[in-house]
């Protein structure tokens, strides 16, 4: 599965209805299932190819404040490009290019969440550098939100940053959040559940 696009909160109403443009155009996909939002999961709408080899998932994550698409298929690329364009989505490459041009844009809480959701499972230096910069931001709310966002990729490279924040951050809540995240990271990286 690959997370491929995020949508700002303002796009949520069109996507939340389940009647987005992607559902009206065929793309070889048909409605498969809708999973309502619960305490442990976001709302999810799933479309599948007629042979069930491809599935496109749209998740409305109220905790992160974003809506995003996930595709699972051997031929993700063509579906990904079409879905991103049709729904006016934001890919990781586009997001990184935008924050390179305007670094202040990365301080938006929705952008921080999108970076976390779109970060690949394997280490990506540009994303790591952006997160490192945000973890050092002067604003405690930005650092705290970034700690939540880095849980999505859970790269071991974050451990030293979390250790430093858990012991040295000037803000109590950020230190506390870093301690909790560090414990979760270490448990995840050790293979424990």
List each language-model region with its residue ranges.
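Short Lys/Arg-enriched alpha/beta "domain-start" segment
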Residues: 1-60
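Surface-facing alpha-helical segments and adjacent helix-coil boundary elements at the starts of domains
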Residues: 37-105
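Structural detector for internal amphipathic alpha-helices that build alpha-solenoid repeat scaffolds
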Residues: 68-86, 109-122, 143-155, 176-189
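Amphipathic alpha-helical scaffolding segments comprising HEAT/armadillo-like alpha-solenoid repeats
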Residues: 89-100, 121-134, 156-167, 190-193
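HEAT-repeat alpha-solenoid elements in large eukaryotic scaffold proteins
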Residues: 101-112, 136
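Short inter-helical turns and helix N-cap capping residues of alpha-solenoid HEAT/ARM repeat scaffolds
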Residues: 103-104, 138-139, 170-175
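Amphipathic alpha-helical interaction elements
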Residues: 151, 166-170
């Amino acid at each position: 599965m690959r997370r491929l696009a995020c949508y700002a909160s303002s796009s949520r109403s069109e996507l939340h209805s389940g009647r987005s443009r992607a559902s009206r155009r065929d793309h070889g996909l048909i409605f498969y299932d809708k999973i309502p939002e619960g305490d442990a999961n976001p709302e999810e709408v799933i479309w599948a190819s007629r042979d069930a080899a491809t599935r496109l998932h749209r998740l409305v994550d109220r905790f992160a404040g974003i809506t995003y698409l996930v595709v699972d298929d051997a031929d993700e690329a063509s579906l990904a490009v079409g879905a991103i364009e049709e729904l006016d989505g934001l890919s990781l490459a586009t997001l990184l290019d935008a924050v390179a041009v305007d670094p202040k844009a990365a301080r938006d809480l929705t952008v921080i969440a999108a970076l976390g959701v779109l970060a690949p499972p394997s280490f990506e230096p540009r994303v790591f550098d952006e997160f490192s910069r945000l973890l050092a931001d002067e604003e405690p709310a930005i650092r705290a939100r970034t700690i939540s966002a880095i849980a999505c990729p859970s790269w071991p490279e974050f451990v030293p940053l979390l250790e430093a924040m858990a012991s040295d951050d000037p803000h109590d809540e950020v230190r506390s959040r870093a301690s909790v995240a560090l414990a979760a990271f270490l448990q995840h990286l050790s293979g424990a559940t």
